[in-house]
Swiss-Prot record:
Protein name: Ubiquitin-fold modifier 1
Keyword DNA damage assigned: no
Crosslinked residue numbers (Glycyl lysine isopeptide (Gly-Lys) (interchain with K-? in acceptor proteins)): 83
Proregion positions: 84-85
One of the GO BP terms on file: protein ufmylation
Any one of the GO CC terms: nucleus
Localisation: Nucleus; Cytoplasm
PTM (free text): UFM1 precursor is cleaved by UFSP1, promoting its maturation: processing of the C-terminal Ser-Cys dipeptide is required to expose its C-terminal conserved Gly residue.
InterPro entries tied to this protein: Ubiquitin-like_domsf (IPR029071), UFM1 (IPR005375)
Organism in which the protein naturally occurs: Gallus gallus
Family per similarity comment: Belongs to the UFM1 family.
Domain of life: Eukaryota
Cross-link entry Glycyl lysine isopeptide (Lys-Gly) (interchain with G-Cter in UFM1), positions: 69
Amino acid sequence: MSKVTFKVTLTSDPRLPYKVLSVPESTPFTAVLKFAAEEFKVPAATSAIITNDGIGINPAQTAGNVFLKHGSDLRIIPRDRVGSS
């Protein structure tokens, strides 16, 4: 089975840390999002992955589809809950 590799950058950190993830191309992208969020210690439920152009990626597809459509350079954005205590 073929693998795809993503470079995921954490945009909320001024140092712009990144992780390189290699997954089988049939992996659901929701799993990639969850794993990337765990690696950066941000909540997966309130995070989104976007392209460098700022285009949001629908996680309801395979990692292979995302790679073909958007390439390997992605960003993760943790969405903070404003006003919650």
